[in-house]
């Protein structure tokens, strides 16, 4: 069969400005500034006319008139329907024709005028979030569905950009590629893709498709700072083709936005497409070969066009971009891609052929060979030393052990990953044997045994390697090399071109192209390990949602499964490491050895309820009161902050006889009935206004950034509202006033100078008591102040604390005066089952010890200033940063859409948090409008982690979210 593209050369039209101006004026009555728009083989010009913007399309004479008629008909077909996306419309010329003809330099061209769609091409954005990728797939599928009943003779044509003809395009134009090695590789890989497609072609559905839903043809509107695809332009590639090819074209165009992970780009586009127009298993099987085909034919086409138009900037950029995309696609193992894409839409991943049965053990095993746990949750990993070699060594017997395939593992530094092979540990010098027959070669430091047409055995960690063309089972390949942890790594790889690292992200799909070498490793047969599915975290989330109340929220839409913490880092089940910027519960850091030791010791001795008499309860209470000013000398021990604030409310009622409480607007104090009543945060208590009991009296939020009062007298002016309520209630009718000394729920907003002093004076003058809620902001987190109330230079009547008091072990406290405390006795005794338990108090004392010994309050000053300075510098470049609140390591980055109106950037904040999680930083929004990034990491955070946070925030704000 002849190649329809052999010898076909299609240079773009190049009409000069004067001619274009005449066409617009004479035929369409349009005039104004012109701007050339890029195109591979047509000429497109935008005119900014007084009546609006329009696109003049000068079509290449190499394309059929019938095809142009089909394009116009398709645009009108869609424009006349209630489709969920925007499309351009063709406009008639002075003669009433939708297609006109002009002649330039002896060549006749078809010309059309179409409406211009407002927005920005998707191509102009760097980073594209998974939600945007899925939306792009949704748009492509929505267009295909809307065209499904469209028919026109012009749909049936042979087109260079039809992915069905990619092989012919590569054959016709590969000669334009000057890089001989690159050309040969491209031709070879294209042939492999075509071979796979030939076997599937009969199962691939054909339908009318736009076939060019690419980033240059998709127009977006801004939605919460994200590009949101909502329009499609340029119907130049419209034809009847494979539906699966439509997906491939849509996906390949976006790979340039994420060259380091092309597979996830295609998976997300597929997910969006499949939700509208479901693909079959055969179509999903064909998708990666189609991706390869599109990438290869794009390179060949661009290189050929460059020969025709060597000075065209659009073509030059296309060549560079197409090569980058090709190289990214080229690195993805095909089996991995098929497996990931199948699982993305709920199809079973294809099964690999079974590896050959081992005919010889890999080594001569001793009698006892333990299985070694190197998982994220391995008990042998010391959180202090983080010596992963020692964690393995402690499990070995006489230096022997066997590792696990498909296991999520930690790394000594940075991210871990999932193991693509397994290893055995053995004394140095142990001979390593070929388990099966095969050909052997050395590749770098590895020995590679080619077993059959599917499998390669890759062995690392050997010395004295013996390489021969063929080996029989039992042939010595080398010996275990000397090293800190001697052993050999075995990987069974079903891919001839790539060998994966030992640890990879699960999303890479490498577990679909490798197998467990268990049978070839173990001293006795054991079943191959089946790794957890790639969507394991999502499955666990489904189980969580099925068994837990919906009100019990979780971070993130698709949260990682976190199973380990160390210091200021969190680790998911696959070994991915995250900088933890939100965990003020573990104030010392995760897995603190002193807290672990104290809790373990106490658990071995005693843990019981607080009615028993034991030393830890007294010792912790004495230490706590020593940290507080007089006359705060009497302690109630509880378990949580909500419980602490509930006790504080009871103390107020018992001591004053009044139930009336003043609380600050938009604050949060807990989830119990009483504390919920005094919490008016919109996010935490959206029904506060309608459900507020009569004894709760809300005063103006003393927020000098968002509130009505600013300047040096703001504290007094906000306190006027406290005085107003006190006056309305009257002396003797005021129970108390509760406030966080630093406005934690608003993101660490510092109260105006003098506010608490004035508010406390007004309340006390009326016979009321003042509660400082230090649950979030106290305990040294502010750096310069151990307690938040110190920053306001006041002493409360009651202080509540919890959350960080036991570094994650439930323990909280209410501290007041002896006189106030004794008033509660008149109502009966006080008891909290686990409040002040021996274990809780042991953890709390260990926490106080470490705060002092490790200088963590001073670290909060230093690192907090570093973060604030870095964010303030970013604010000079990014107006979305309205201000930086707080002190020490209780900070809030308030995001706004307008620095004058302070319109909250709520959706942007959530998108930024999602993007930062992808980049390895855990941060969350807070505040009434959920537009403040809360920065309250463990106080052990160091400069490197703070800089990582700043770097990730910089990238996110620069490249998008």
Segments and roles (model prediction):
Residues 349-380, 469-472, 482-541:
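Acidic, glycine-rich catalytic/binding loops that coordinate metals and/or anionic ligands
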